[in-house]
Amino acid sequence: MMAGCGEIDHSINMLPTNRKANESCSNTAPSLTVPECAICLQTCVHPVSLPCKHVFCYLCVKGASWLGKRCALCRQEIPEDFLDKPTLLSPEELKAASRGNGEYAWYYEGRNGWWQYDERTSRELEDAFSKGKKNTEMLIAGFLYVADLENMVQYRRNEHGRRRKIKRDIIDIPKKGVAGLRLDCDANTVNLARESSADGADSVSAQSGASVQPLVSSVRPLTSVDGQLTSPATPSPDASTSLEDSFAHLQLSGDNTAERSHRGEGEEDHESPSSGRVPAPDTSIEETESDASSDSEDVSAVVAQHSLTQQRLLVSNANQTVPDRSDRSGTDRSVAGGGTVSVSVRSRRPDGQCTVTEV
């Protein structure tokens, strides 16, 4: 009998702690022990199973997923929607936790409602509150939080700016869920985008539309010249005209220095309108259409006197060391009655031939 009693006592000690001693062995099935979390190294609170079959606390998986979407043991990827649709080992345990074991429970503020703390955190808060502490620290999802029991707020220890209200209230108030796990299975609420809050809050982040800012173009805008859009690389018509005038002016100046004796040509003395300079009136070189026609009638006289004019030019150039431009410009010295003139004028005909006439 003594041995039998010893065996009976030994079998009772081998039973799980949650099994009553007066329960019959034949009427109960062997129960599974609560697994331990490999992240927090404690007994799992609301254990969830990953696709790789590893089991962790729900909040531990949530905190680890922010650092990397992989299992903490085998490094297998965690599905994107796992936190919204976790695989609970015991859904009944979640409902039992929401009902609570006492009269009061602790809650933290969420969007459009309150969340109930998990059992472990609720015990820590209740213990600090009963002892009259002003604040206490909580480890939630790998982050240290400070619960200010005077102002009834919580915040991260290294980030005091973001605060969340907390409260101690009766267990039967309406709530959204426990520790980020929803009690309802509404598909519309499950798929809401939630912020990365370690305590399981579901504050919906403001989903603003993708704003596309216009890129600052490195190309200069098109400029308008006389109502026409021109590119900065494309020269304007005025610029091309001024360039042509500049080249013409350079060519004329080169011709003037090379052949000072040919300054009698009419077109070389005309200034471009764009140069902005008003030339002195020179009637001897201003050539009109009537002058050109009268010169064509006197072709024979011009040819006869061509040799005489060249001799006179040579004599005048030899006598003058510094030729006067005003004297050589062919100033009009016409004499009434067909008088002779000592200065000859060289004009350009419309056909491009140069003729020398005496006035």
Curated annotation (Swiss-Prot):
Task: Describe the location of the WWE domain by residue ranges.
Answer: 92-168
Tissue specificity statement from the Swiss-Prot or TrEMBL entry: Ubiquitously expressed. Up-regulated in brains from patients with Alzheimer disease.
**Residue(s) carrying Phosphoserine:** S290, S294
Q: Where in the cell is it found?
A: Cytoplasm, Cytosol; Nucleus
Stretches of Acidic residues bias are at 284-298
What reaction(s) does this enzyme catalyze?
S-ubiquitinyl-[E2 ubiquitin-conjugating enzyme]-L-cysteine + [acceptor protein]-L-lysine = [E2 ubiquitin-conjugating enzyme]-L-cysteine + N(6)-ubiquitinyl-[acceptor protein]-L-lysine
Q: In which pathway does it act?
A: Protein modification; protein ubiquitination
MF GO annotations: poly-ADP-D-ribose binding; ubiquitin protein ligase activity; ubiquitin-protein transferase activity; zinc ion binding
Question: A single GO CC term, please?
Answer: cytosol
What happens when you mutate Y145A? Loss of iso-ADP-ribose-binding
Result when mutating Y108A: Loss of iso-ADP-ribose-binding
The UniProt annotation puts the region (Disordered) at 254-359
ZnF RING-type: positions = 37-75
Q: Which UniProt keywords apply?
A: Cytoplasm, Isopeptide bond, Metal-binding, Nucleus, Phosphoprotein, Transferase, Ubl conjugation, Ubl conjugation pathway, Wnt signaling pathway, Zinc, Zinc-finger
Under the heading InterPro entries, the entry gives:
RING-HC_RNF146, RNF146, WWE-dom_subgr, WWE_dom, WWE_dom_sf, Znf_RING, Znf_RING/FYVE/PHD, Znf_RING_CS
Which domain of life does this protein belong to? Eukaryota
User: What, per the annotation, is the impact of changing W106A?
Assistant: No effect on Wnt signaling pathway
A single Pfam family, by name? Answer: WWE
Query: Which disease shows up in the entry for this protein?
Result: Defects in RNF146 are a cause of susceptibility to breast cancer.
Q: What else is known?
A: Was named dactylidin after the Greek term 'daktylidi' for ring, 'the thing around the finger'. Was named Iduna after the Norse goddess of protection and eternal youth.
Task performed by this protein = E3 ubiquitin-protein ligase that specifically binds poly-ADP-ribosylated (PARsylated) proteins and mediates their ubiquitination and subsequent degradation. May regulate many important biological processes, such as cell survival and DNA damage response. Acts as an activator of the Wnt signaling pathway by mediating the ubiquitination of PARsylated AXIN1 and AXIN2, 2 key components of the beta-catenin destruction complex. Acts in cooperation with tankyrase proteins (TNKS and TNKS2), which mediate PARsylation of target proteins AXIN1, AXIN2, BLZF1, CASC3, TNKS and TNKS2.
Q: Let me see what the UniProt entry remarks about domains.
A: The WWE domain mediates non-covalent PAR-binding.
- Protein's name in the database: E3 ubiquitin-protein ligase RNF146
* Recorded name of the encoding gene: RNF146
